[in-house]
Amino acid sequence: ANRILENQATVDGLTGCLNRRGMENRLDEVQHGFGRGGVSERITLVLFDIDFFKQYNDTYGHLAGDDCLKTVASIPRSMAQNSKDFVARYGGEEFVVVLVDTSLKDALVFAERMRTRIEQLGLPHTGSRISQVVTISVGVASAGNCDNDATNLIKCADEALYQAKGAGRNRVAYMSDQGRVVTL
């Protein structure tokens, strides 16, 4: 019974991903698993959201929106290689992928593959101003390039995501080791 309650408290019922609370718990576990209380330099956070998702819901309805969220979430879940990696629904149409023991370079390859695979799903999206299919914008940050805690890692990834959106969406941006956001 306790396991069921814990699962309900930490897993998003729609997508099967961790929810925000579950993500914070797992990130804390990973963080403390490396000792010293700081985030490992080998943790990379990939933050993404679905471009023009509100318009998607307005165009196709909330049931279709739910199906879109489930389908999009399944892509990074199927791509995660390391048993310590995890995917969480951060809120609304925003998701986080935490890649453990992954360099920034490898995380960027992961992010671009994920972006491409989601676009190639071909989910129709006539409400999008950039494409006729569902796309995502992605921000990537590595613990080695941000202040050494989970809150700052998320903040760095969010800055990169904001830059990806500002550069036209449907792209990946990342926080460089010089503290600048670079768009691919």
Predicted regions and their residues:
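Short regulatory alpha-helical coupling segments
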Residues: 4-7, 20-42, 73-82, 100
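Conserved nucleotide-binding and Mg2+-coordinating catalytic segments in signaling enzymes
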Residues: 6-25, 48-62, 70
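Cell-envelope/extracellular polymer assembly enzymes that use nucleotide-activated donors
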Residues: 44, 137
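Alpha-helical scaffold within the catalytic cores of cyclic-nucleotide enzymes
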Residues: 73-77, 106-125, 158
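PAS-family sensory domains
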Residues: 132-134
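A short pre-motif secondary-structure segment
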Residues: 86-89
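Catalytic-core segments of nucleotide cyclases and related cyclic-nucleotide turnover enzymes
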Residues: 100, 104-112, 128-129, 141-184
